[in-house]
A protein has these predicted regions:
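Radical SAM enzyme core and accessory elements
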Residues: 265, 278-279, 283-348
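Radical SAM [4Fe-4S] cluster-binding motif and immediate context
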Residues: 52-223, 243
């Protein structure tokens, strides 16, 4: 329950010392048929955490497709949490959990971040960096300026994520001057009513369209994040999201499957509507959905996720061919492989 760094250390220390573990904070522990629901300790000071230990991973784990090629990539936490509380996101539950305990959102100092990035670059010959920040630009301007100045000591391309509301010409110029190579923006749904009322993302279509239009004129690589499979969402709604992506003409198209994280408002809705087992855990957003919805089947969702980028990028004259990929059998799979090769050659 909550953060695990100090909780795990405390648990292991108690087990090693053969001490009672039932009072370990940030954990609910079942022992002898009784459940001990312990409280939440104060949020971790990110600057106090040690540098990541990458020696436990095989080197091949760090080679990732970033910036249009496979690069030795390091992932670095810039802040933890999010000042927003979208109803489908795990940060919704974490913000609620820590509301009376200092709040969940916090930022790592820029100097601490840069020190770790420099150490990892020198030790592992990093070629690329991915910054973990729910929205890179949703912070004080002074903090961004400090990062840009100190990042000169790291000097490798990096990728960020941001919200459409934070994109303007001034921020784009800052990013271009900093060594930022790419940026991902969350669309999530192309249906504005669903986006606002169900997801809690209070932004209109014009805001999103303007953000992508400004980025299209920049030197930054751009991708759009989408999610399908929300409760109440229909096939028609999903195609609204496809059409919205076609309108912005973004180079990179990412699509995930909605999964109901515990503690979120949308999970509560799914439970109330009987869309899932009460004891079900959220699945892998890249390949699984745990919802059983009357308006669209699991199989249809999985197929639409697979061919979503094809619908976005190919001309509509190809849509009948793409739709055939939704079928079962070898013929549908062979056609999907053929179209995927064409997609790679034309659009990647």
């Amino acid at each position: 329950v909550g953060e695990g760094e100090y909780a795990l250390v405390e648990l292991c220390t108690k087990i090693e010392g053969k001490q009672d573990i039932t009072s370990t904070q940030n954990m609910w522990i079942k022992q002898d048929g009784k459940i001990y629901k312990n409280g939440i300790r104060k949020p971790v000071d990110l600057d106090e955490l040690p540098f990541q230990d990458w020696t436990i991973f095989e080197p091949r784990r760090f080679y990732k497709p970033m910036g249009g090629k496979i690069s030795m990539t390091g992932t670095f936490e810039m802040n933890r949490g999010c000042p927003y509380s979208c109803r489908f996101c795990s940060d919704y539950g974490l913000n609620k959990l820590y509301a009376n305990n200092g709040g969940y959102y916090r930022e790592k100092s820029i100097k601490r971040l840069i020190d770790e990035m420099k150490e990892k670059k020198e030790r592992y010959n990093l070629e690329f960096a991915y910054l973990v920040a729910e929205s890179f630009l949703t912070t004080k301007r002074e903090r961004i300026a400090e990062f840009i100045e100190l990042y000169k000591e790291v000097d490798i391309p990096f990728w960020i994520e941001a919200r459409p509301e934070s994109i303007n010409e001034e921020n784009i110029k800052l990013l271009e001057s900093s060594g930022c190579e790419g940026i991902s923006l969350g669309i999530e749904s192309g249906n504005m009513e669903l986006r606002r009322n169900l997801l809690g993302r209070n932004m209109n279509d014009e805001t999103i369209l303007k953000a992508f239009s400004l980025l299209e004129k920049s030197s930054l690589r751009v991708s759009a994040n989408n999610i399908i499979g929300f409760p109440t969402e229909t096939r028609e709604n999903i195609f609204e999201t496809i059409e919205f992506n076609r309108k912005i003409n973004v180079p990179g198209v990412m699509v995930s499957l909605y999964n109901p994280y515990k503690g979120t408002a949308l999970r509560e809705y799914c439970d109330e509507e009987g869309l899932m087992r009460k004891d079900a855990h959220a699945g892998d957003y890249r390949s699984e959905t745990v919802l059983n919805m009357p308006q669209i089947s699991r199989e249809e969702l999985l197929n639409l996720q697979k061919i979503f980028p094809l619908y976005v990028k190919f001309p509509k004259s190809e849509w009948p061919r793409i739709e055939k990929c939704e079928g079962d059998g070898q013929e549908a799979e062979a056609l999907y492989e053929e179209l995927s090769r064409e997609y790679t050659e034309k659009y990647l």
